[in-house]
Protein backbone atom coordinates (compact mmCIF):
# COMPACT_ATOMS: atom_id res chain seq x y z
CA UNK A 1 0.00 0.00 0.00
CA UNK A 2 1.12 3.55 -0.71
CA UNK A 3 1.89 5.92 2.14
CA UNK A 4 0.18 9.22 2.84
CA UNK A 5 2.73 11.83 3.89
CA UNK A 6 2.31 15.37 5.22
CA UNK A 7 5.07 17.93 4.63
CA UNK A 8 4.70 21.08 6.73
CA UNK A 9 6.71 23.92 8.20
CA UNK A 10 7.45 23.87 11.91
CA UNK A 11 8.59 27.48 12.30
CA UNK A 12 7.25 30.80 10.96
CA UNK A 13 7.32 29.62 7.35
CA UNK A 14 10.14 29.93 4.79
CA UNK A 15 11.70 26.66 5.98
CA UNK A 16 12.33 25.28 2.48
CA UNK A 17 9.20 23.16 2.03
CA UNK A 18 8.92 23.62 -1.74
CA UNK A 19 12.20 21.92 -2.53
CA UNK A 20 11.47 18.96 -0.27
CA UNK A 21 7.96 18.52 -1.63
CA UNK A 22 9.34 18.56 -5.16
CA UNK A 23 11.97 15.99 -4.19
CA UNK A 24 9.46 13.63 -2.55
CA UNK A 25 6.87 13.92 -5.32
CA UNK A 26 9.04 11.57 -7.34
CA UNK A 27 7.31 8.86 -5.29
CA UNK A 28 3.85 10.44 -5.02
CA UNK A 29 0.86 10.10 -7.29
CA UNK A 30 -0.97 13.10 -5.85
CA UNK A 31 0.22 16.35 -4.23
CA UNK A 32 -2.42 18.26 -2.28
CA UNK A 33 -2.56 21.84 -0.96
CA UNK A 34 -4.97 22.01 1.97
CA UNK A 35 -4.75 25.54 3.43
CA UNK A 36 -3.59 29.07 2.77
CA UNK A 37 -3.69 30.88 -0.54
CA UNK A 38 -1.30 32.75 -2.79
CA UNK A 39 0.31 34.32 0.27
CA UNK A 40 2.58 31.26 0.35
CA UNK A 41 5.79 31.26 -1.68
CA UNK A 42 7.42 27.93 -2.54
CA UNK A 43 10.73 28.14 -4.38
CA UNK A 44 11.97 25.20 -6.47
CA UNK A 45 15.46 25.03 -7.98
CA UNK A 46 16.00 22.22 -10.48
CA UNK A 47 19.33 22.06 -12.31
CA UNK A 48 19.80 25.75 -11.50
CA UNK A 49 16.40 26.71 -12.94
CA UNK A 50 14.30 28.60 -10.38
CA UNK A 51 10.49 28.40 -10.17
CA UNK A 52 8.40 30.22 -7.55
CA UNK A 53 4.89 28.91 -6.91
CA UNK A 54 2.29 30.56 -4.69
CA UNK A 55 -0.93 28.63 -5.17
CA UNK A 56 -0.37 25.57 -7.35
CA UNK A 57 1.18 22.57 -5.53
CA UNK A 58 4.93 22.09 -5.95
CA UNK A 59 4.47 18.75 -7.72
CA UNK A 60 3.22 20.49 -10.87
CA UNK A 61 6.64 20.16 -12.52
CA UNK A 62 6.43 16.35 -12.39
CA UNK A 63 4.69 14.67 -15.32
CA UNK A 64 3.61 11.66 -13.24
CA UNK A 65 1.81 13.67 -10.54
CA UNK A 66 -1.72 15.04 -10.17
CA UNK A 67 -1.82 18.29 -8.19
CA UNK A 68 -4.88 19.14 -6.12
CA UNK A 69 -6.07 22.39 -4.54
CA UNK A 70 -8.28 21.33 -1.63
CA UNK A 71 -11.28 23.05 -0.07
CA UNK A 72 -9.18 24.59 2.71
CA UNK A 73 -7.34 26.81 0.22
CA UNK A 74 -8.69 30.30 -0.53
CA UNK A 75 -8.40 30.75 -4.28
CA UNK A 76 -7.80 34.02 -6.14
CA UNK A 77 -8.81 33.43 -9.78
CA UNK A 78 -6.49 36.14 -11.12
CA UNK A 79 -3.50 34.77 -9.17
CA UNK A 80 -4.27 31.24 -10.33
CA UNK A 81 -4.42 32.33 -13.98
CA UNK A 82 -1.14 34.23 -13.67
CA UNK A 83 0.55 31.14 -12.28
CA UNK A 84 -1.00 28.82 -14.86
CA UNK A 85 0.11 31.07 -17.73
CA UNK A 86 3.64 31.29 -16.31
CA UNK A 87 3.88 27.51 -16.18
CA UNK A 88 2.34 27.01 -19.62
CA UNK A 89 4.90 29.40 -21.12
CA UNK A 90 7.53 27.03 -19.74
CA UNK A 91 5.88 24.05 -21.38
CA UNK A 92 4.07 22.64 -18.33
CA UNK A 93 0.67 21.11 -19.32
CA UNK A 94 -1.12 22.48 -16.26
CA UNK A 95 -4.65 21.45 -17.27
CA UNK A 96 -3.57 17.81 -17.46
CA UNK A 97 -2.10 17.86 -13.95
CA UNK A 98 -4.22 20.24 -11.84
CA UNK A 99 -7.54 19.55 -10.06
CA UNK A 100 -9.51 21.95 -7.85
CA UNK A 101 -12.20 21.57 -5.19
CA UNK A 102 -15.46 23.38 -5.95
CA UNK A 103 -15.61 24.21 -2.24
CA UNK A 104 -12.57 26.52 -2.31
CA UNK A 105 -13.54 30.00 -1.07
CA UNK A 106 -12.87 32.70 -3.66
CA UNK A 107 -10.60 35.69 -3.04
CA UNK A 108 -12.05 38.64 -4.94
CA UNK A 109 -10.81 42.24 -5.37
CA UNK A 110 -12.77 43.59 -2.40
CA UNK A 111 -10.96 41.13 -0.10
CA UNK A 112 -7.62 42.58 -1.18
CA UNK A 113 -8.90 46.15 -0.76
CA UNK A 114 -10.07 45.33 2.77
CA UNK A 115 -6.76 43.67 3.64
CA UNK A 116 -4.76 46.73 2.59
CA UNK A 117 -7.17 49.19 4.24
CA UNK A 118 -7.05 47.35 7.56
CA UNK A 119 -3.27 47.15 7.66
CA UNK A 120 -3.05 50.86 6.91
CA UNK A 121 -5.57 51.64 9.67
CA UNK A 122 -3.59 49.60 12.21
CA UNK A 123 -0.54 51.82 11.71
CA UNK A 124 2.30 50.70 13.99
CA UNK A 125 0.21 47.73 15.13
CA UNK A 126 0.02 46.23 11.64
CA UNK A 127 0.20 42.43 11.57
CA UNK A 128 2.29 42.32 8.41
CA UNK A 129 -0.13 40.55 6.08
CA UNK A 130 0.76 40.13 2.40
CA UNK A 131 -2.21 42.31 1.45
CA UNK A 132 -3.56 39.58 -0.81
CA UNK A 133 -7.00 39.21 0.74
CA UNK A 134 -6.37 35.93 2.54
CA UNK A 135 -7.76 36.93 5.94
CA UNK A 136 -10.90 38.68 4.66
CA UNK A 137 -11.69 35.68 2.42
CA UNK A 138 -11.45 33.29 5.39
CA UNK A 139 -13.63 35.69 7.41
CA UNK A 140 -16.33 35.49 4.74
CA UNK A 141 -16.09 31.70 4.81
CA UNK A 142 -16.59 31.53 8.57
CA UNK A 143 -19.37 34.15 8.40
CA UNK A 144 -21.10 31.99 5.76
CA UNK A 145 -21.35 34.84 3.29
CA UNK A 146 -18.35 33.82 1.19
CA UNK A 147 -18.49 32.82 -2.46
CA UNK A 148 -16.93 29.53 -3.53
CA UNK A 149 -15.53 28.23 -6.80
CA UNK A 150 -18.68 26.19 -7.38
CA UNK A 151 -20.83 29.33 -7.18
CA UNK A 152 -19.27 30.53 -10.44
CA UNK A 153 -21.05 27.78 -12.36
CA UNK A 154 -24.48 29.39 -11.91
CA UNK A 155 -23.97 32.91 -13.29
CA UNK A 156 -27.33 34.29 -12.16
CA UNK A 157 -27.01 33.02 -8.60
CA UNK A 158 -23.37 34.14 -8.43
CA UNK A 159 -24.33 37.67 -9.50
CA UNK A 160 -26.97 37.85 -6.76
CA UNK A 161 -24.65 36.56 -4.04
CA UNK A 162 -21.82 38.84 -5.20
CA UNK A 163 -24.03 41.94 -5.09
CA UNK A 164 -25.06 41.15 -1.53
CA UNK A 165 -21.56 40.56 -0.18
CA UNK A 166 -20.10 43.53 -2.04
CA UNK A 167 -22.74 45.88 -0.63
CA UNK A 168 -21.58 44.85 2.83
CA UNK A 169 -17.84 45.18 2.15
CA UNK A 170 -18.06 48.36 0.09
CA UNK A 171 -19.94 49.98 2.96
CA UNK A 172 -17.03 49.11 5.25
CA UNK A 173 -14.48 50.37 2.73
CA UNK A 174 -16.15 53.73 2.11
CA UNK A 175 -17.74 54.54 5.46
CA UNK A 176 -15.29 53.08 7.95
CA UNK A 177 -11.93 52.98 6.18
CA UNK A 178 -12.65 56.01 3.95
CA UNK A 179 -11.40 54.16 0.87
CA UNK A 180 -12.80 53.80 -2.63
CA UNK A 181 -15.47 51.19 -3.30
CA UNK A 182 -14.68 48.19 -5.50
CA UNK A 183 -16.63 48.09 -8.78
CA UNK A 184 -19.32 45.40 -8.81
CA UNK A 185 -19.77 45.06 -12.58
CA UNK A 186 -16.06 44.72 -13.22
CA UNK A 187 -15.66 42.15 -10.43
CA UNK A 188 -18.59 40.14 -11.80
CA UNK A 189 -17.33 40.23 -15.39
CA UNK A 190 -13.78 39.18 -14.48
CA UNK A 191 -14.95 36.32 -12.25
CA UNK A 192 -17.42 34.84 -14.73
CA UNK A 193 -14.91 35.12 -17.59
CA UNK A 194 -12.95 32.14 -16.28
CA UNK A 195 -15.84 30.11 -14.83
CA UNK A 196 -15.87 27.51 -17.62
CA UNK A 197 -12.10 27.16 -17.52
CA UNK A 198 -12.14 26.51 -13.76
CA UNK A 199 -15.06 24.10 -14.10
CA UNK A 200 -13.00 21.89 -16.41
CA UNK A 201 -10.53 21.32 -13.56
CA UNK A 202 -12.99 20.88 -10.68
CA UNK A 203 -13.61 17.55 -8.98
CA UNK A 204 -14.83 15.97 -5.74
CA UNK A 205 -11.47 16.06 -3.94
CA UNK A 206 -12.48 14.03 -0.88
CA UNK A 207 -13.85 11.21 -3.05
CA UNK A 208 -10.82 11.28 -5.36
CA UNK A 209 -8.36 11.04 -2.46
CA UNK A 210 -10.29 8.25 -0.80
CA UNK A 211 -10.30 6.22 -4.01
CA UNK A 212 -6.57 6.88 -4.43
CA UNK A 213 -5.92 5.67 -0.89
CA UNK A 214 -7.92 2.49 -1.46
CA UNK A 215 -5.96 1.87 -4.66
CA UNK A 216 -2.70 2.16 -2.72
CA UNK A 217 -1.55 5.30 -4.52
CA UNK A 218 0.85 7.47 -2.45
CA UNK A 219 -0.40 10.94 -1.55
CA UNK A 220 1.66 13.93 -0.38
CA UNK A 221 -0.01 16.81 1.46
CA UNK A 222 1.86 20.10 1.07
CA UNK A 223 1.58 22.63 3.88
CA UNK A 224 2.04 26.37 3.46
CA UNK A 225 3.47 28.89 5.96
CA UNK A 226 4.47 27.25 9.28
CA UNK A 227 3.20 25.88 12.59
CA UNK A 228 3.93 29.08 14.54
CA UNK A 229 1.64 30.98 12.15
CA UNK A 230 -1.35 28.69 12.79
CA UNK A 231 -4.53 30.64 13.54
CA UNK A 232 -5.14 28.60 16.73
CA UNK A 233 -1.67 27.50 17.85
CA UNK A 234 0.58 30.29 16.59
CA UNK A 235 1.76 33.60 18.05
CA UNK A 236 -1.76 35.06 17.96
CA UNK A 237 -2.67 37.64 16.66
CA UNK A 238 0.52 37.69 14.55
CA UNK A 239 -0.59 34.62 12.62
CA UNK A 240 -2.12 33.64 9.31
CA UNK A 241 -5.84 32.91 8.91
CA UNK A 242 -5.72 29.14 8.38
CA UNK A 243 -4.68 25.96 10.18
CA UNK A 244 -1.09 25.37 9.10
CA UNK A 245 -0.74 22.33 11.34
CA UNK A 246 -1.30 18.66 10.49
CA UNK A 247 -4.91 18.86 11.66
CA UNK A 248 -5.59 21.15 8.72
CA UNK A 249 -4.99 18.28 6.30
CA UNK A 250 -8.26 16.56 7.15
CA UNK A 251 -10.42 19.68 7.25
CA UNK A 252 -8.77 21.25 4.21
CA UNK A 253 -8.97 18.25 1.89
CA UNK A 254 -11.63 15.89 3.22
CA UNK A 255 -9.06 13.14 3.76
CA UNK A 256 -9.59 10.95 6.84
CA UNK A 257 -7.03 11.77 9.57
CA UNK A 258 -6.51 8.10 10.55
CA UNK A 259 -5.06 7.45 7.11
CA UNK A 260 -2.06 9.80 7.51
CA UNK A 261 1.09 7.69 7.86
CA UNK A 262 3.96 10.14 8.31
CA UNK A 263 4.34 13.84 9.18
CA UNK A 264 7.58 15.41 7.97
CA UNK A 265 8.39 18.65 9.79
CA UNK A 266 10.59 21.05 7.82
CA UNK A 267 12.95 22.89 10.16
CA UNK A 268 15.58 25.42 9.18
CA UNK A 269 18.94 25.10 10.98
CA UNK A 270 18.28 28.57 12.37
CA UNK A 271 15.04 30.59 12.55
CA UNK A 272 13.52 33.40 10.51
CA UNK A 273 10.35 35.41 10.68
CA UNK A 274 8.94 37.85 8.13
CA UNK A 275 6.72 40.74 9.14
CA UNK A 276 5.66 41.71 12.65
CA UNK A 277 5.32 39.52 15.72
CA UNK A 278 7.34 38.17 18.67
CA UNK A 279 10.62 36.38 18.02
CA UNK A 280 12.57 35.45 21.19
CA UNK A 281 15.81 34.35 19.47
CA UNK A 282 16.00 37.20 16.96
CA UNK A 283 19.54 38.41 16.23
CA UNK A 284 19.80 42.14 15.60
CA UNK A 285 23.57 42.06 15.17
CA UNK A 286 26.31 41.08 12.72
CA UNK A 287 25.52 37.36 13.13
CA UNK A 288 21.91 38.04 12.18
CA UNK A 289 23.11 40.00 9.16
CA UNK A 290 25.41 37.10 8.25
CA UNK A 291 22.57 34.56 8.40
CA UNK A 292 20.22 36.82 6.47
CA UNK A 293 22.73 37.55 3.71
CA UNK A 294 24.14 34.04 3.36
CA UNK A 295 20.69 32.47 3.56
CA UNK A 296 19.20 34.90 1.00
CA UNK A 297 16.44 35.60 3.48
CA UNK A 298 13.91 37.52 1.44
CA UNK A 299 10.27 36.43 1.14
CA UNK A 300 9.37 34.53 -2.04
CA UNK A 301 5.94 36.19 -2.09
CA UNK A 302 6.57 39.77 -0.93
CA UNK A 303 10.34 40.17 -1.26
CA UNK A 304 10.40 41.44 2.33
CA UNK A 305 13.57 40.95 4.34
CA UNK A 306 13.22 38.15 6.88
CA UNK A 307 14.32 38.52 10.50
CA UNK A 308 16.97 35.89 11.43
CA UNK A 309 17.72 34.27 14.79
CA UNK A 310 18.97 31.11 16.50
CA UNK A 311 17.04 27.85 16.33
CA UNK A 312 14.32 27.75 18.98
CA UNK A 313 13.90 24.23 20.38
CA UNK A 314 11.18 25.35 22.79
CA UNK A 315 8.99 26.33 19.86
CA UNK A 316 10.02 23.22 17.92
CA UNK A 317 8.89 20.98 20.79
CA UNK A 318 5.46 22.56 20.54
CA UNK A 319 5.48 21.89 16.79
CA UNK A 320 6.34 18.23 17.40
CA UNK A 321 3.51 17.97 19.90
CA UNK A 322 0.81 19.65 17.79
CA UNK A 323 1.69 17.93 14.51
CA UNK A 324 2.73 14.47 15.75
CA UNK A 325 5.95 15.00 13.78
CA UNK A 326 7.37 11.64 12.67
CA UNK A 327 10.71 13.04 11.57
CA UNK A 328 12.38 16.30 10.61
CA UNK A 329 14.01 17.60 7.48
CA UNK A 330 16.79 20.01 8.51
CA UNK A 331 17.31 22.69 5.85
CA UNK A 332 19.93 25.37 5.21
CA UNK A 333 22.56 23.68 7.35
CA UNK A 334 25.16 25.22 5.03
CA UNK A 335 24.18 28.75 6.13
CA UNK A 336 25.77 28.05 9.54
CA UNK A 337 29.13 27.24 7.88
CA UNK A 338 31.89 29.57 9.07
CA UNK A 339 30.42 30.53 12.44
CA UNK A 340 32.74 30.06 15.43
CA UNK A 341 29.83 28.94 17.56
CA UNK A 342 26.16 28.13 17.09
CA UNK A 343 23.44 28.53 19.69
CA UNK A 344 20.19 26.75 20.44
CA UNK A 345 17.34 28.14 22.54
CA UNK A 346 16.50 25.52 25.17
CA UNK A 347 14.29 27.58 27.50
CA UNK A 348 12.42 30.85 28.04
CA UNK A 349 13.34 32.94 31.08
CA UNK A 350 10.64 35.21 32.51
CA UNK A 351 11.33 38.50 34.37
CA UNK A 352 10.89 36.78 37.76
CA UNK A 353 13.73 34.38 36.93
CA UNK A 354 11.64 31.29 36.26
CA UNK A 355 12.56 29.27 33.18
CA UNK A 356 9.94 27.54 31.03
CA UNK A 357 10.47 24.85 28.42
CA UNK A 358 7.03 25.30 26.84
CA UNK A 359 5.78 28.18 24.73
CA UNK A 360 3.24 30.81 25.79
CA UNK A 361 -0.16 30.67 24.11
CA UNK A 362 -0.24 34.22 22.70
CA UNK A 363 2.07 36.95 21.46
CA UNK A 364 1.96 38.88 24.74
CA UNK A 365 3.59 35.96 26.55
CA UNK A 366 6.44 35.75 24.05
CA UNK A 367 7.20 39.44 24.52
CA UNK A 368 8.07 38.81 28.19
CA UNK A 369 10.68 36.09 27.71
CA UNK A 370 14.45 36.03 27.21
CA UNK A 371 15.93 32.98 25.46
CA UNK A 372 18.09 30.57 27.45
CA UNK A 373 20.82 29.64 24.96
CA UNK A 374 23.01 26.55 24.77
CA UNK A 375 26.28 27.16 22.92
CA UNK A 376 28.00 24.62 20.67
CA UNK A 377 31.21 24.83 18.61
CA UNK A 378 30.72 25.92 15.02
CA UNK A 379 32.60 24.61 11.98
CA UNK A 380 34.80 26.24 9.36
CA UNK A 381 34.41 23.51 6.73
CA UNK A 382 31.67 23.77 4.10
CA UNK A 383 28.58 21.61 4.18
CA UNK A 384 27.17 23.15 0.99
CA UNK A 385 26.12 20.53 -1.53
CA UNK A 386 27.01 17.59 0.73
CA UNK A 387 25.12 14.45 -0.29
CA UNK A 388 26.22 12.04 2.45
CA UNK A 389 26.63 12.22 6.22
CA UNK A 390 30.29 11.27 5.83
CA UNK A 391 30.91 14.60 4.08
CA UNK A 392 29.73 16.63 7.07
CA UNK A 393 32.21 18.04 9.63
CA UNK A 394 32.05 16.53 13.10
CA UNK A 395 30.81 19.77 14.68
CA UNK A 396 27.86 19.84 12.26
CA UNK A 397 27.08 16.21 13.08
CA UNK A 398 27.20 17.07 16.79
CA UNK A 399 24.74 19.92 16.19
CA UNK A 400 22.34 17.58 14.38
CA UNK A 401 22.64 14.94 17.11
CA UNK A 402 21.95 17.51 19.82
CA UNK A 403 18.80 18.68 18.05
CA UNK A 404 17.57 15.09 17.84
CA UNK A 405 18.21 14.65 21.58
CA UNK A 406 16.41 17.85 22.54
CA UNK A 407 13.44 17.25 20.25
CA UNK A 408 13.25 13.48 20.85
CA UNK A 409 12.56 13.20 17.13
CA UNK A 410 14.87 11.96 14.36
CA UNK A 411 16.23 14.17 11.59
CA UNK A 412 15.45 11.98 8.58
CA UNK A 413 16.43 14.38 5.79
CA UNK A 414 19.21 16.99 5.59
CA UNK A 415 19.27 19.74 2.96
CA UNK A 416 22.58 21.43 2.14
CA UNK A 417 21.63 23.64 -0.80
CA UNK A 418 18.70 24.88 -2.90
CA UNK A 419 18.88 22.25 -5.66
CA UNK A 420 16.93 19.01 -5.26
CA UNK A 421 20.20 17.07 -5.65
CA UNK A 422 21.78 18.76 -2.61
CA UNK A 423 19.91 16.56 -0.15
CA UNK A 424 20.53 13.55 2.10
CA UNK A 425 17.53 11.28 2.60
CA UNK A 426 18.46 9.18 5.64
CA UNK A 427 14.94 7.80 6.07
CA UNK A 428 12.44 8.09 3.23
CA UNK A 429 8.95 9.08 4.47
CA UNK A 430 7.40 6.95 1.72
CA UNK A 431 9.44 3.83 2.50
Curated annotation (Swiss-Prot):
SMART domains: Adenylsucc_synt
Residues binding Mg(2+): 14, 41
Main location: cytoplasm
Gene3D superfamilies, per the entry: Adenylosuccinate Synthetase, subunit A, domain 1 (3.40.440.10), Adenylosuccinate Synthetase, subunit A, domain 2 (1.10.300.10), Adenylosuccinate Synthetase, subunit A, domain 3 (3.90.170.10)
Known pathway: Purine metabolism; AMP biosynthesis via de novo pathway; AMP from IMP: step 1/2
Binding site for substrate: 300-306
Keyword annotations from UniProtKB, A to Z: Cytoplasm, GTP-binding, Ligase, Magnesium, Metal-binding, Nucleotide-binding, Purine biosynthesis
Domain of life assignment: Bacteria
Cofactor binding remark: Binds 1 Mg(2+) ion per subunit.
Binding site for GTP: 13-19, 41-43, 306, 332-334, 415-417
Active site, renumbered: 14, 42
One term under GO cellular component: cytoplasm
InterPro entries (UniProt xref): Adenylosuccin_syn_GTP-bd (IPR018220), Adenylosuccin_syn_Lys_AS (IPR033128), Adenylosuccinate_synth_dom1 (IPR042109), Adenylosuccinate_synth_dom2 (IPR042110), Adenylosuccinate_synth_dom3 (IPR042111), Adenylosuccinate_synthetase (IPR001114), P-loop_NTPase (IPR027417)
Subcellular location: Cytoplasm
Entry cofactors: Mg(2+)
GO molecular function, one term: GTP binding
Group of enzyme by EC: ligase
Catalyses which reaction(s): IMP + L-aspartate + GTP = N(6)-(1,2-dicarboxyethyl)-AMP + GDP + phosphate + 2 H(+)
Record: residues binding IMP: 14-17, 39-42, 130, 144, 225, 240, 304
GO process terms (BP): 'de novo' AMP biosynthetic process; IMP metabolic process
HAMAP family associated with the record: Adenylosucc_synth
PANTHER family from the UniProt entry: ADENYLOSUCCINATE SYNTHETASE
The protein's assembly and partners: Homodimer.
Family designation: Belongs to the adenylosuccinate synthetase family.
Reported function: Plays an important role in the de novo pathway of purine nucleotide biosynthesis. Catalyzes the first committed step in the biosynthesis of AMP from IMP.
Protein's name in the database: Adenylosuccinate synthetase
Gene this protein is translated from: purA
